[in-house]
Amino acid sequence: MSKCRFDEVSLFPEAFNNFFNHGLIKKSFEERIASIHIHNPRDHAIDNYRKVDDEPYGGGAGMVLKPEPYFSVFDQIPKLNKKRILLMTPQGRKISQSDFCRWSTQDQLILICGSYEGFDERIRSFADEEISIGDFVLTGGEIPAITVINGVVRLLPGTLGSAESLEEESHNEFLLEHPQYTRPSEFKGMKAVSYTHLTLPTILRV
């Protein structure tokens, strides 16, 4: 059994294909560090046209995602005890590295991707958290969901080659890293600078 199960609820499952086929993310799924299960609400539509959206009550621009297909998907997803259900929405709370750390301790993350004008409000009822990756609007929740998977998977034990990579990385202490260099020590007149021993001003010394 994998260390973390991801369940993606998305109208566009093909958006995730290339993401899982390279780098550390591919390695984590191949080695069963994590597993991914994608669910398309269109497969749960209740009419012959596989319709998943409708006009908003009261009028207005755009189409609203219908509750029936999403509730049907949600009911059929196996639920683990230690889980979080995340709704991708522009109105959600902006996430940070601390959220990835918190979610990496879960056995299951269910990520619900929106599209069109948004969700029927009743779909929000089964979400533990409504989240956003920034103060902007995208065409759907797939990119935020991919961001969450990427941020969480790399924190799972066995994904990165060295534990030090996690301990020393940029945002663990919410500080930016110093500039990084590698060989050659000089390139086109530009020299690499060693930050192994930094001299701090007296006021910053502990």
Task: Describe the role of every protein-language-model region.
Residues V64-C113, D120:
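S-adenosyl-L-methionine/SAH cofactor-binding core of RNA-modifying enzymes
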Residues L155-K191:
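Internal, active-site/partner-interface "lid" segment
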Residues M1-I77:
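N-terminal nucleotide/polyanion-binding subdomain common to many enzyme families
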Residues G23-K27, C101-T105, D128:
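Short, solvent-exposed amphipathic alpha-helical segments in soluble enzyme
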Residues F119, I123-E164, E169:
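Structured adenosyl-cofactor binding patch, chiefly the S-adenosyl-L-methionine
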Residues D7-V9, H37-H39, L86, L109-I110, ...:
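Hydrophobic/aromatic beta-strand patches that form the interior of the parallel beta-sheet core
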Residues T196-T199, L204:
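Conserved small/polar residues in nucleotide/adenosyl-binding loops
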Residues P41-H44, S115-F119:
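Short glycine-enriched loops at secondary-structure junctions
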